[in-house]
Amino acid sequence: QRQMCIETDVKAARDKAGQISTVYTCCAEAFPNTFTFSDPAEAAWTVLHAVAGGYDGYLRWAVNSWTADPLRDSRFRTWAAGDTYSIYPGPRSSIRFERLVEGIQDCEKIRILREELTTKGAKGKLEKLNKTVAKITPEGLSETQESATQMVNEIHKLLNTL
């Protein structure tokens, strides 16, 4: 069985050996991703799915590998438009980058809430949080038929009520 990006037994062996396992997004994954044509919520989803899989971190391969004219054309060779950057030259962000930051903040909220709910013995709330987070995987997308946007909105609603 696969756990998102690697075989479940490989991930378990790495965990047992104390090795760090991170997840990486680049142009190989067509969906969800952070391309200029991607739904903005997919940027948050890509980070959240690292938490769902129990990974130690997330890496987006590039944020500022600009094309020749990044303000006008985000295409680079045969790669999907926007794959090489999510911020622009100068003091310019993008919706894609801001949603990526949002996903990172959500991951920290999840970490803090898990600690607090465990300390308080709030098992029901912790189970609800963990169940909602666990869906944020490629398998969860196909099993639930929910979009990345729906999953991100659901976790936001929960994080803001716990």
Protein language model features and the residues they cover:
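Extracytoplasmic/secreted cell-surface and envelope-processing proteins
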Residues: 7-11, 30-34, 67-70
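Catalytic domains of carbohydrate-active enzymes that cleave complex glycans
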Residues: 55, 71-162
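Active-site clefts of carbohydrate-active enzymes
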Residues: 16-45, 62
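Extracellular protease catalytic domains of secreted zymogens
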Residues: 36-38, 53, 61-62, 69, ...
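Conserved, mostly hydrophobic/aromatic
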Residues: 50
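Short amphipathic alpha-helical segments and helix-helix/interface helices
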Residues: 9-14, 46-47
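Short, small-residue-biased leader/transition segments that mark boundaries at the very start
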Residues: 1-6
